[in-house]
């Protein structure tokens, strides 16, 4: 039977999805299932790894059944995943010894402080491209080994395996035959040297983590093993995987130095491909691994904003100013400007490039004439201002002045926001026809790995732009508006 489709498994923080793409990179079928968020203590976030697997495997069955697709027609399955989330399981039984510790979880803060006290901060920055923060997997692994009874003894005996979610899914799909990750996920563990592309012995020693725990690192665009859907039908190749933000970068075909994308979700993630050069950031960004045009390792600068779409949820849920996120475009367009109002949504501090956990949200510039529309508009504009903060930092670090920004995520449907993003950055903003770019990136990697598609050049002919947003304000206005934003940010940090 002819191979007509590629399936992407998109394992996210709140739901597991499966998306089928045809040879023209069109979406054929989608299935999604949410799973339980666990909060056992303040600042702790966990998932049940078995529930993640159950939700992911069930949507895989469902997405094919819904479209009437036979497993013989599927060329490959690609994987993209929430990054940093940590699972440890028994090699012999496949049973997790503890819940997955999620990227958002802050329980390992004390371990990070111990590493800082040992003088490891600069070594971590130089060799992993990351900051010493509980966000990343390494300190989560140490916490499990230190706190789960008998875990360290089992690990020393080589009886346990660690994986980020990509590794866990491949292990389950291949029925325990394959223990593997890719460089984009490995680079988020705090244990991977992004220059030598190997596990870092000094950091393993500092965290007391046995090497036997860790997966083999294979290219993002390669075949890892095979699986059968629900144990039935013909074998399908599991091929191609990347962490969610790097998958989106590849899905947008940002495979050359200086190409960048911004994902507008709960927060915003802006990544710029820097090619074969790992650029050290002096402006609060992370240096991370990306995927090049032939599936090889490239590097990227990454900046994250904590409050993107979450700011709009706040308008809806806490202030009751809107009923639906889509209402914001209508209300924001009813006024010519914000009437001098700025919203700095530092509800949980500020992310890149400030990294200020103590900053708090604030509204500035309120006068008697300020109304609901001005506040809603200021909330939308805050997303674009924060993205400009990241872009400016990237320009300073890389020396590359961006001309075009590719965008994806839920908020890109908002034309007002996209136009203001173009205006305030003085950069053309490109919105793709298929906004599921994270899943598309996983599908592209899988399809390229098995020859379903020949090259990135072929994929470029399939990538359609829905709309171009061209900068439409003068330089003087741009400078004045952004100066107001910078002043507002400074005051939230005072």
From Swiss-Prot:
GO terms for cellular component: cytosol. It catalyses: glycerol + ATP = sn-glycerol 3-phosphate + ADP + H(+). Inhibited by fructose 1,6-bisphosphate (FBP). ADP binds at residues 13, 17, 266, 309, 410, 414. GO terms for biological process: glycerol catabolic process; glycerol metabolic process; glycerol-3-phosphate metabolic process. Keywords: ATP-binding, Glycerol metabolism, Kinase, Nucleotide-binding, Transferase. InterPro entries: ATPase_NBD, Carb_kinase_FGGY, Carb_kinase_FGGY_CS, FGGY_C, FGGY_N, Glycerol_kin. This is Glycerol kinase. It comes from Shewanella baltica (strain OS155 / ATCC BAA-1091).
């Amino acid at each position: 039977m002819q191979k007509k489709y590629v399936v992407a498994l998109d394992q996210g923080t709140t739901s597991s999805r499966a998306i089928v793409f045809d040879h023209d990179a069109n979406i054929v079928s989608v299935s999604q299932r949410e799973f339980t968020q666990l909060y056992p203590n303040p600042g702790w976030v966990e998932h049940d790894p078995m529930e993640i697997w159950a939700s992911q495997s069930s949507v895989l069955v469902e997405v094919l059944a819904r479209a009437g697709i036979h497993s013989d027609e599927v060329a490959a399955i690609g994987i993209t995943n929430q990054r940093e989330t940590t699972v440890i399981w028994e090699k012999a039984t496949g049973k997790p010894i503890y819940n997955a510790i999620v990227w958002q979880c802050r329980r390992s803060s004390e371990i990070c402080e111990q590493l800082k006290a040992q003088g490891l901060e600069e070594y971590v920055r130089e060799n992993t491209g990351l900051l010493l923060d509980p966000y990343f997997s390494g300190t989560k692994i140490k916490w499990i080994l230190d706190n789960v009874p008998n875990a360290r003894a089992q690990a020393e005996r080589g009886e346990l395996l660690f994986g980020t979610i990509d590794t866990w899914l491949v292990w389950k799909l291949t029925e325990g035959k394959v223990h593997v990750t890719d460089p984009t996920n490995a680079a988020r563990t705090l244990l991977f040297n992004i220059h030598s592309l190997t596990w870092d012995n000094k950091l393993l020693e500092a965290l007391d983590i046995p090497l036997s725990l860790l997966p083999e690192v294979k290219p993002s665009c390669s075949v890892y093993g095979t699986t059968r859907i629900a144990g039935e039908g013909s074998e399908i190749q599991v091929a191609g995987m990347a962490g969610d933000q790097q998958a989106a970068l590849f899905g947008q075909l940002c495979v050359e130095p200086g190409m960048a994308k911004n994902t507008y979700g709960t927060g915003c993630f802006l990544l710029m491909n820097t090619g074969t050069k790992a650029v050290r950031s002096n402006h609060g960004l992370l240096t991370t691994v990306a995927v090049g045009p032939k599936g090889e390792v490239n590097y990227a600068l990454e900046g994250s904003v904590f409050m993107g779409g979450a700011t709009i949820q706040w308008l809806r849920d806490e202030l009751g100013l809107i009923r639906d996120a889509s209402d914001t475009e209508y209300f924001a367009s009813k006024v010519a400007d914000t009437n001098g109002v700025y919203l700095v949504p530092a509800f949980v501090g500020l992310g890149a490039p400030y990294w200020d956990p103590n900053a708090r949200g604030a509204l500035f510039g309120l006068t008697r004439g300020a109304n609901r529309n001005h506040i809603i508009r200021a909330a939308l504009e805050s997303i674009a201002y924060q993205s400009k903060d990241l872009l400016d930092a990237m320009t300073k670090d890389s020396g590359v002045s961006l001309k075009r920004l590719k965008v994806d995520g839920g908020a890109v449907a908002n034309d007002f926001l996209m136009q203001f993003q173009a205006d305030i950055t003085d950069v053309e903003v490109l919105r793709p026809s298929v906004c599921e770019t994270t899943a598309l990136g996983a599908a592209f990697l899988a399809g390229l790995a098995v020859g379903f598609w020949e090259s990135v050049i072929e994929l470029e002919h399939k990538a359609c732009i829905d709309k171009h947003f061209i900068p439409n304000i003068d330089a003087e206005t741009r400078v004045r508006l952004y100066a107001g934003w910078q002043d507002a940010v400074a005051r939230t940090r005072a």
